Amino acid sequence: MGSTPTDLPGEDVADNRSGVGGGISDVYGEDSATLDQLVTPWVTSVASGYTLMRDPRYNKGLAFTDKERDAHYLTGLLPPVILSQDVQERKVMHNLRQYTVPLQRYMALMDLQERNERLFYKLLIDNVEELLPVVYTPTVGEACQKYGSIFRKPQGLYISLNEKGKILEVLKNWPQRGIQVIVVTDGERILGLGDLGCQGMGIPVGKLSLYTALGGIRPSACLPITIDVGTNNEKLLNDEFYIGLKQRRATGQEYAEFLHEFMCAVKQNYGEKVLVQFEDFANHNAFDLLSKYSDSHLVFNDDIQGTASVVLAGLIAAQKVLGKKLADHTFLFLGAGEAGTGIAELIALKISKETGAPITETRKKIWLVDSKGLIVSSRKESLQHFKQPWAHEHKPVKDLIGAVNAIKPTVLIGTSGVGQTFTKEVVEAMATNNEKPLILALSNPTSQAECTAEQAYTWTKGRAIFGSGSPFDPVVYDGKTYLPGQANNCYIFPGLGLGLIMSGAIRVRDDMLLAASEALAAQVTEEHYANGLIYPPFSNIREISANIAACVAAKTYDLGLASNLPRAKDLVKFAESSMYSPVYRNYR
């Protein structure tokens, strides 16, 4: 039986029943209800006073002016001092720098995001190089591993197998309606850390905070989602703090039907133009989902396509340093999963467009090594379908050093997810075969990188052109300072997403990824080359994203896949004007 007030709201009602916590003004019965009675939760609808201060979208903390405090019933609820947003930013950065443990910084930033959204994004935009490793790789990996223990407040939408048949209803529970970007994971392959199940939510949350900070997409237009189909991680299944379903992963038809219901519900609820980014799915599901929905939805896989685009940009930029065209290189990959095959395919496509050779021929410039050795034609029948295009004629080679010595690559790319696999012997062999070996150790987080920047420069006697997935500090070798490049997907996906949104794209095509790569490479200056960089610094990432967005949008219009008409005359200015600003608004 529900607890229904017998007097009119607003009147003082005394309830002197013993054993319950009622009292004066308990008109809705929340305090006087016993455990077996139902209570209706309610909130005020006007954002003022205490409610306004607790709403992260509108809260300004001590930046509320005297006029705003009077108008919105805040007087007395805040100390009398008024601080500008810039002063607040300096204060938060000062406090963050007191933490010596990166996870503590991560937790403090997530707390700020839940408390004061605009201050969080201003902080991230103005201090991107310092804070990017905190809100994303490598710290987000540790955060996901410990997500159950540090969990304070839900972020994003959780859709579990329990909701099968009613996913559309669950989507409608999300309070924002104008969603433009969804980042979704099932938690099976989080970075290089494996199956973290429901605790993978840290990845969509982190990715979307970067869509806003780096690409200027409104926070209210972003939706992080975790699909919980169980986990095969025994440690999590036995962890009392684990926040997900404690059951083995659904697979096969059950999994496919659940994901199909999700994709249909997304399109029904948010329309044709919502961008769905698949994030950290296991290889077999990642390729299948991208293939299945690329012709019916606006979908993008950052692990396959985003990584490919940013790596290709680095290779295009490196042409000036190496004096070689892409077609003149021989590429060797360690790792033949989502990232490795995705990068390889985009490189082959770029060479094909430059030379006019069919892609079946340009693929022969690219070799892949997996856990069983070099991928060659004699293994083709036993290979997964996404590896088969890379099975070339060659005698079997069992390990990486054997492949380096046999193939003699000019470019070595690591996407294995296994740290320290570019051994001294491997790197020295690259240096023996090349005057300036190009070495990209792309696996995340830092602990899983195939080699460190210091190792690459030391073992090649300072001759390597090095890039990594996670950040490394500058390296001093033989009296010279080397600045490692970071082949970070953050260069690509924010600008790509903005370009798709501002053009009203209805599908993603490889030509758009090529456009993003070329736009990024074009922003590497002679000064950057002089410092050994093949990527521009992150300090002007919003300018980079605007240029990428403009090129992606232009390609979308050229392909006839844009729905926002007419086309803006100056797409760069349009991109810049479309970006979310975290500066505080003035309230009436």
Curated annotation (Swiss-Prot):
Its activity is regulated as follows: Activated by coenzyme A (CoA), aspartate, succinate and fumarate. Repressed by oxaloacetate, glucose and ATP.
Assigned protein family: Belongs to the malic enzymes family.
Name of the molecule in the record: NADP-dependent malic enzyme 2
GN (gene name): NADP-ME2
Catalytic residues per the record? 136, 207
Q: Where does a divalent metal cation bind?
A: 279-280, 303
**Which amino acid positions bind NADP(+), per UniProt?**
189, 303, 332-348, 444
Its ancestry begins with:
Eukaryota, Viridiplantae, Streptophyta, Embryophyta, Tracheophyta
**Top EC category:** oxidoreductase
| Record PROSITE patterns | MALIC_ENZYMES
A GO CC annotation recorded here is: plant-type vacuole
**What does the free-text pH dependence field read?**
Optimum pH is 6.8.
**Tissue distribution of the protein:** Expressed in leaves, stems, flowers and roots. Particularly present in vasculatures, trichome basal cells and hydatodes.
Single GO MF annotation: oxaloacetate decarboxylase activity
Which Pfam family, giving just one, matches this sequence?
A: malic
